[in-house]
Amino acid sequence: VWRIVVLATSGVRNPSAGDLTPIVLAVVLAALVFSAVVVIQPGQTKVVQFFGRYVGTARRTGLSMLLPLTTKRGVSVRVNNFETNVLKVNDAEGNPVEIAAIIVWQVADTAKASFAVESYKDFVKVQSEAALRHVATSHPYDDPDGHGESLRGSTDVVSGELATEVAERVRVAGVEVLEVRISHLAYSPEIAQAMLQRQQ
């Protein structure tokens, strides 16, 4: 095997260091240019860091030239929504209820979304469920007398309170809450029949 390698390379002359300089420079220059080129899709941004320091956020869609030797992390600025898990909580009167909500949100500050929390998507989900628990426990499920706000009778008010609380909790992650709606509300199965009979 070694004999074949020696025979194959015997006709190749040994280039001097001066002959390789233009090739090395061309390769280095090409690497720098390609490290600066980035394609940004609609609804996406690129958070740019230069050796660990935040430089800025590229928002213009299409082909862009950024600083070479930078790291670029994609952050979506599209509108997102998700439905919380169905939570079992006690209302203000101590009755166990099931409640869930739909949260519509969007990243407003890409730097905060990238650096303030580990995962802004997980953060939004956890904080939304925590806010939903808090709001659900501060109101009764129903108000038969009609004197106060209840989860069932004042859904717009409760949704507004929930939107405000979720927005306050996720602001640190650079997230803006666009809309919140209660998607599921019911007494827990173990007391649902008894509460239905009481209402009748």
Indicate where each model-derived feature is located.
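Short beta-strands and strand-coil junctions in structured, solvent-facing domains, enriched
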Residues: Y54-V55, T110-A113, S188-E190
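Long, charge-rich amphipathic alpha-helical coiled-coil "stalk/tentacle" segments
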Residues: E190-Q200
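Short glycine-enriched loops at secondary-structure junctions
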Residues: S183-A186
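Aromatic-capped interface at the extracytoplasmic side
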Residues: L7-V12, A31-T45
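Hydrophobic alpha-helical transmembrane segments of multi-pass membrane proteins
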Residues: V24-F34, L151
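Membrane-cytosol interface motif
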Residues: T45-T70
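Hydrophobic alpha-helical transmembrane segments
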Residues: W2-V28
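Amphipathic, interface-forming alpha-helical segments with heptad-repeat character
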Residues: F51, T70, V77-R181
